[in-house]
From Swiss-Prot:
An annotated Gene Ontology molecular function: NADP+ binding
Enzyme class at the top of the EC tree: oxidoreductase
The organism of origin for this protein: Neisseria gonorrhoeae (strain NCCP11945)
Reaction(s) catalysed (UniProt annotation): N-acetyl-L-glutamate 5-semialdehyde + phosphate + NADP(+) = N-acetyl-L-glutamyl 5-phosphate + NADPH + H(+)
Keyword ATP-binding: no
Major location category of this protein: cytoplasm
Stated name of the protein: N-acetyl-gamma-glutamyl-phosphate reductase
UniProt keywords, alphabetically: Amino-acid biosynthesis, Arginine biosynthesis, Cytoplasm, NADP, Oxidoreductase
Gene behind the chain: argC
Pathway: Amino-acid biosynthesis; L-arginine biosynthesis; N(2)-acetyl-L-ornithine from L-glutamate: step 3/4
Length: 347
């Protein structure tokens, strides 16, 4: 592009915020023009994040001082409940918005208010938001003024299911079970006891067993693609003793004798961030660390009619900031891979 995209990041002091800063620094067509934080206003980005020394000369500003309305696009990497208050004004001024929180993901307002425990401040804008699962909604994302970036668990679980659901290959009335594990960074950067090394290290536990906020988000995607499946969906997340990474093991029943691996390969043939592994492979979280990739394998369980799908992503990249940059590329007519060519880190 002859003119760089001017980007702003609201709430840039969390893990998704610094991941956006890292990825956008390597993007040839983006200039990060504003980064905001009420608590760190006046602090240089490079002082707050030493990993970005020599990369950014910006300082954090309050949202009111940052000139966000002069940006082409603004990313909200904020806690739930912020974007729904601040995004409408920017959209009215012609700024395109990608919200990495959950404010615009769930279309049914009472459902959202039930799971997130607050009154929605911009219910009229929810219907205009495009759900930014890039590989599902490319055409709509390209035209969007507001993109609701998916959650990490919904991304990891939905990507292997989308091709099968679109062809109505899942068997109605049967359980669809997602057994998921996340690294501790998924809990965010704010201090809490459960994220302490002495609590999360050398330990493994389920959480949200009574119901996780990502459950209605995943069910919404399922219900929009095939009838009779969402009602049988069961989702249990676990906290794994690692920093980054997400692993989903999904158990499903197919309605016919088709080869699901072929269905996935055909659907994702032109999707550069999707890697369908050979049958019998077991994708590992370390194989996607730091990269905007989703690796998937699928095989039939021994002596059973149950199929087992394995899906891995980096929860901070494909599960958050990387998918947001991918959506930005689509919105501005760029190649999806632009600025996202990083190779996974190993070890």
């Amino acid at each position: 592009m002859s003119k760089k995209i001017k980007a702003g990041i609201v709430g840039a002091t969390g893990y998704t915020g610094v991941e956006l800063l890292r990825l956008l620094a390597a993007h040839p067509d983006v200039e990060v023009a504003a980064v905001t934080s009420r608590s760190e206003a006046g602090t240089a980005v490079a002082d707050y994040f030493p990993s970005l020394r020599g990369v950014y000369g910006l300082a954090f500003q309050t949202p009111d001082e940052a000139g966000l309305e002069q940006c082409d696009i603004v990313f909200f990497a904020t806690p739930n409940g912020i974007a729904m208050k601040d995004a409408p004004r920017l959209i009215e001024q012609g700024v395109r918005v990608i919200d990495l929180s959950a404010d615009f993901r769930i279309r049914d307002i009472p459902t959202w208010e039930h799971w997130y425990g607050m009154t929605h401040a911009a219910p009229g804008l929810v219907s205009q938001a495009v759900y930014g699962l890039s590989e599902l909604n490319r055409e709509a994302v390209a035209q969007a003024r507001l993109v609701a970036n998916p959650g990490c668990y919904p991304t990891c679980v939905s990507l292997p299911l989308v091709p099968l659901l679109r062809q109505c290959r899942l068997k109605p009335g049967m359980p669809l079970i997602a057994d998921c594990k996340s690294g501790v960074s998924g809990a965010g950067r704010k201090g809490n006891v459960g994220s302490l090394l002495c609590e999360a290290g050398d330990n493994f536990k389920a959480y949200g067993t009574a119901g996780h906020r990502h459950l209605p988000e995943i069910r919404q995607t399922i219900a929009g693609l095939q009838d009779g499946i969402a009602e049988g969906f069961v989702f249990t997340p676990h906290l794994a003793p690692m920093i980054r990474g997400m692993h989903a093991t999904v158990y499903l029943h197919l309605s016919d004798g088709s080869d699901p691996e072929t269905v996935l390969r055909d659907y994702y043939r032109d999707s550069p961030f999707m890697d369908i592994l050979p049958a019998g492979s077991t994708p590992e979280t370390r194989s996607v660390r730091g990269a905007n990739l989703c690796r998937i394998s699928i095989r039939q369980a021994a002596q059973s009619d149950v199929w087992v799908v394995l899906s891995v992503i980096d929860n901070l990249v494909k599960g958050a900031a990387g998918q947001a940059v991918q959506n930005m590329n689509i919105m501005f007519g760029l190649e999806e891979t632009h600025g996202l060519g990083g190779i996974p880190l190993l070890p």
